[in-house]
Every structure is written in C-alpha cells, then in structure tokens.
A protein has these predicted regions:
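Short, contiguous alpha-helical
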Residues: 28-84, 125-169
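Short, helix-capping/interhelical loops that line the mouth of catalytic, cofactor-
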Residues: 1-5, 55-112
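Hydrophobic packing residues in well-ordered alpha-helices of helical domains and bundles
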Residues: 10, 39, 109-113, 151-154
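N-terminal leader/capping segments at the start of a protein or of a new domain
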Residues: 21-25
Length: 169
C-alpha cells in the first residue's frame, strides 16, 4: 500500500469507529460484558494508542538513532495481522483506559482523536516510501515494526475494537 493510501486508510478507519461510537446512546456507551471494556473505554483506548504518534513521527533523527532500520523484508498487511493475532492481544498498562468513563467525556475524547489524526496525517507526509519501509518503531506486542507495518496494524486496530463493541452490544 502506497503512503497516500496508507494514511487515508488509517484516518478513515479511525473516523469510522469514532462515528460509530458517537452514535451510541448512554446505555450502549457504558455497557460492557463481564471482563470486557465499554464502548467508552474502547474509545479512550484508541486515543491512548494514537496519541504518541505525532511527537515520535516528528523526530525522524531520533527514530533512526534509537530504533534503527529493519533487517528483514517489510511484512505485508496480511502478515502483520497474522502475527498480531498470534500475540496476547492484551493492551500494555499505558494503553489501558480508565475503569469508569462517563458519556460526558465522549465529545472531548472524540475531539482529541480528531486533532491527533490531523497531526499524524501532517507529520506522515514528511516520510518517503523508503523511510516507511526501513525506519522502525517498537510495538509492545510485536517488537520492531517498520513505520509502514505499524500503520498497517494501526489501520486495523480501530476496526478490531469496533467489532468487539458490536459483538458485545
């Protein structure tokens, strides 16, 4: 997937899930099956997972020096997802939402997601196709991923959570 298509898919998938959650009523927003997150918690989790990207992507030199280049061929979208589904799928502590999330916070979280997506899109434009395939970032479950692979995964990620919400309601 080319850079332009990749960022568009990333943005579109996040906006689709945000729109879905925004359409939920208070009962649906706060409902969770035992041991699962509410739709509100899913929304906050999505924000927590994208929030670091504008800052880190803006630091290309830091990425190169700290994490280096990948020493294997870039994984396809399918390979990224296959490898992801083999992990625990358990969110690390820094990405776990608050226990209780009031519907009053929904609009604020959505606004923050929107502004974060805009910032990510702007910074992403500074990357070449080659940099997307060579520069790496650490993923808590998959280890080093190229930036392209990270965005493959992060494009899928909100859809995974939307599916969880839909199954749970």
């Amino acid at each position: 997937m080319k850079k332009h298509d990749l960022i568009n898919e990333f943005i579109k998938n996040h906006q689709e899930v945000v729109q879905y959650i925004d359409g939920l009523n208070e009962s649906e927003f706060g409902y969770a099956q035992i041991g699962k997150w509410t739709a509100g918690q899913q929304l906050e989790h999505i924000l927590l997972t994208i929030k670091p990207f504008p800052k880190i992507l803006n630091a290309k030199t830091f990425i190169r020096e700290k994490f280096g280049n990948i020493n294997r061929p870039t994984w396809s979208y399918r390979t990224v997802l296959e490898n992801y589904t083999k992990t625990s799928l358990k969110a690390p502590a820094q990405f776990v939402p608050q226990r209780e999330l009031s519907i009053d916070r929904k609009a604020g979280i959505i606004a923050e997601i929107d502004s974060t997506l805009k910032a990510i899109s702007e910074v992403f434009e500074n990357y070449t196709e080659d940099e997307l395939d060579t520069l790496t970032l650490p993923h808590p479950l998959l280890g080093q991923l190229t930036i392209r692979e990270m965005f493959y995964l992060m494009s899928y990620h909100p859809l995974h959570h939307q599916k969880q919400i839909m199954i749970g309601l």
